[in-house]
Amino acid sequence: MRFPTVILEGKKLPRMIFSVQPQASGGDQKIYPLMKEAYEMGAWCFDLPSANHLKSLKELKHLSTDEALIGLCHVEVETGASFLGKPLHRFGSKIISTIRRGLLPSNLTRNVLPPSSSPEVFTQKEIDRIAFDPPRFEEALSFFDPEESPFLFMGEIYGDWLLALGRIDLLHEMVSRVRGRGFIPIFSGQWATFVLPKAKPLDVAAYAVPINKKWSLFDLQRASDLIKKFEKPVISLNPLADGTLLNESEGAFSFLFDELKIVAAVPGIASPGEAKTLVEALMKFPSLIPPRKT
């Protein structure tokens, strides 16, 4: 069975990229068996959010001898930023307090930011002193291989936070390093209506944000309108709204692929049955063929 595909920067991606998420009782030991069953249904690209996912892909690639089998690894941009020589994650609570106090409307931060234990906030001078950390970022990239993961998700929650702090220059530097290592970057964020306009100048192949038929941050209608007009490719994270749309997956994909013109989706699967349901729904949709140059 051949999945419909999309082409980004000359490389093919399936329009559905499984994120293997076994139930807690099975844990990481069930990643490989479930990945293998999805592969046997036709999946040839997997979301790889952890070292155990990458290990499972390596094992499957070795045993199947399938050179076309690939994954999408994740690099957290926090690994590329430091403050006063210390990793930025040590100042996470201070960043949250800073964003909460003035960089986003209070009605939004209440719902999307974790609680902060810090009464302190960054001054503008301190924000300006957040620096790119080449050794840590290069070390993070060294765990990945462009042959296994030609595309690389980069951003995560610290990507949103750096954009909120006005430090897109750090993201530009990290994108350049990712490309220098031979990867094709895909920027991933959590706050769709905030991230897409702010991150638009980045030299990335696509943008990945949580959006589905039920919700998106900060507002589904605004996010939908923005994506419809967005000039660059968008990938849907959490396309089934935490599994609540599984039994109406064809409609969920139709909303994304037909209405919003989203190029691909990354649904989570916890069982072979879920994978089968999604494969059957996906086959109703075509590949995206780039226009022929004249």
What are the residue ranges of the model-derived segments?
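N-terminal binding-site loop/beta-alpha segment at the start of enzyme catalytic domains
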Residues: 1-69, 255, 259
